[in-house]
From Swiss-Prot:
Binding site for Mg(2+): D456, D462, E465, E466
Keywords for this protein: Aminoacyl-tRNA synthetase, ATP-binding, Cytoplasm, Ligase, Magnesium, Metal-binding, Nucleotide-binding, Protein biosynthesis, RNA-binding, tRNA-binding
Catalytic activity: tRNA(Phe) + L-phenylalanine + ATP = L-phenylalanyl-tRNA(Phe) + AMP + diphosphate + H(+)
Localization, UniProt: Cytoplasm
Domain (tRNA-binding): residue spans on this chain: 39-148
Binding note for cofactor: Binds 2 magnesium ions per tetramer.
Highest classification ranks of the organism: Bacteria, Pseudomonadati, Pseudomonadota, Alphaproteobacteria, Rhodospirillales
Record's keyword annotation contains Protein biosynthesis: yes
Name the record gives this protein: Phenylalanine--tRNA ligase beta subunit
UniProt xrefs under NCBIfam families: pheT_bact (TIGR00472), YtpR (NF045760)
Annotated ranges, domain FDX-ACB: 706-799
CC cofactor: Mg(2+)
Source species: Rhodospirillum rubrum (strain ATCC 11170 / ATH 1.1.1 / DSM 467 / LMG 4362 / NCIMB 8255 / S1)
Annotated GO MF terms: ATP binding; magnesium ion binding; phenylalanine-tRNA ligase activity; tRNA binding
Amino acid sequence: MKFTIGWLKDHLDTQASVADIAEKLTALGLEVDAIEDPTAALAPFVVGHVIEAGPHPDADRLKLCRVDSGTDILQIVCGAPNARTGLKVALALPGAVIPATGDVLKKGKIRGIESQGMMCSTRELGLGEDHDGIIELPADTPVGVPLVDVLALDPVIDIAITPNRADALGVRGIARDLAAGGLGGVIADTLTAIPGRFPSPIGVAIDPETLASGACSHYVGRYFRGVRNGESPAWLKDRLNAIGVRPISLLVDITNYVTFDRARPLHVFDADKLTGTTITARPARQGEILRALDGRSYTLDAPVVAIADGAGPQGLGGIMGGEDTGVDENTVNVFLESALFDPANTAAAGRFLGIDSDARYRFERGVDPESCLLGAELATRMILDLCGGEASELVIAGAPPVWRRTIALRPARVARLGGVAVERAEMVAKLRALGCTVEDDGAEALRVDPPSWRVDIGAEHDLIEEVVRLHGFDLVPAVPLPRDPMPKAVLTPGQRRMITVKRTLATRGMLEAVTWSFLPRAVAKGFGGGQDALVLANPISSDLDAMRPSILPNLIAAAGRNAARGYGDLGLFEVGPRFHGGEPGQQTLVAAGLRAGKIAPRHWSRPARDADLYDIKADVLAAIEAAGAPTASLQVSADAPAWFHPGRSGQIRLGRTVLAAFGEIHPAALALLDVKGPMVGFELDLDALPLPKGRPSKTRPPLTLSPFQPVARDFAFVVEAGVAGDAVIKAARGADKALITDVVIFDVYQGDRLEAGRKSLALSVTLQPTDHTLSDEEIEAVSARIVGAVTKLTGGSLRS
């Protein structure tokens, strides 16, 4: 929110300096972002007098001028159409920096004629957007004096407004705060109601549905006839230019001025462009189209409030007017709108349309509910004074919403919540200075009625904040944080397990990724999700509209982005939630991993190979083992979800519980994400892992080593082709759990030397005695039990 010091002093009687005003604003919570002093950039400029202006000998559009700078007569080549003899101008001498461009002015030749200076336009001085001609100063302006002494430029203060302080989005609201803070007094408002000269030929109405919802609760209108919509006076243009608002025409500038002066947005229609005799605030109908004042066309729907005439929507309530009924230089009859729109509805409509405007910025924060009539009367006075014409009687629909409220303020609570002791009398004085009505009958609590413009004050704690704010945040004593000894941080078993899994995957060369918990619904459907319960009602982006049923698509997309930037060989993992329902608790914590490209960089000692099924299986088994699950009891089956390759994937179970799925990502799943493969991945359900029994201990169990030599024996079994290798391993391991410490498959054969539909699995079994060296008889006995177990449980036979 920007304002000039002169503008502020229209509302605040004070002799305070700019520095004092800025300091007080920050102390009151209206933080000053910047103080702009336009005089600093204009210091080198002086008032010049055009003694003679004649044609340039070599250019029809240029003029050759002799200009008195007060100390010298300069020859200046100028292209401005209004350059003429006798004109007083803003003169830049060589060495001056032009504010609009930052260029240093130098003497130079223009079409063969030396130019020794520059006569400047408003835009070149950074004072506005007008560049059709050079600045024309009053004829009695002294020659050679500094330009800043003539222009009487005001410093501009820019403050940051918190969302609750809608009242400070107008200069008068800022003046009220400064006065309440002890920096001067608010100048009384002398505005009086202006009687209408004739009945308004245009009426106003609020649709019952719109009125009932509160989307528009109060609409005040007024008709003006015989107005002149010309250029605004200099004082009005200067104020708007100073705060960054481009002057357009008298009528538009007046509505903009009231918006920033009183935080009261207004709108004016060209009455001759309206159809019918009634303007209605109603819900927008689906498919209606309006071309707004920003030159863009918008398709309307709820929750937009359409300001409509007999032909359809002519404005977007609380946001922006329509181009078709906008005023222009030919306008002679206008209709003024001063209405009240609901903050939440205006915010929703603005987001739906994608429009940011000064009106929306104020309405969605809350405009003074009593300001419709005030805004209409203030605009009426300015229109009649500056544009002439006659005003009709007011036409009104609806009424201000009920805003009066009485809040009990217990002075004792101020010290408790605010952290500072404030005398009761000071509280009363501060709140009354703020515009509140305060009743103090000596009871425990004060009875406080906030003013209409402070829509943010609704409870006792709001009043306490105001008391402390006006008393001074800097007077709140600093209290050191307590230094009581705190217990050491305690992690739950689940948290410890999550950290352990992360570290394990990181040590295996994977990089941790953190991705969104949502993804496109079409992608979610390809990974078992996309149900209505998992679709977001208000997504942060249209392509992130569903909660993720799996982390894998996010990792696949991340790997694809890395590959597009030249990093195709990588491993990623993420630990986070996946969602299988829309209710609380319908989510699980999972660890997901993905490998793409080569498993290791190229090296002369070994050929490079792509990451495969067995690499990712080793990753997930390492994570399961690190989490403390009984790996010896795991079973592997080939029934992974559909987004895995059916012949190169599997699931890991503990009993009937599915712990993880792993394998090569299905080409269709990669195509859904527009990513090239192959890629392998896994997803481990951490919530499904059994928690460790007993209390955790920081001490490791003793390392038990056998002093006796281990014994390895190899076996080759012929089994049906459909028998899983894991089944053979488990059968062999179960033959003697005390002696057998490891079983691995080191060879698989299917070929002509075996019957069709059968395969050979070669196993290496390690026996580790603990109390004596095994004899040949003991080894043969264990071997026989191994053969018997595999034959019984898998139907296989020892290969001869």
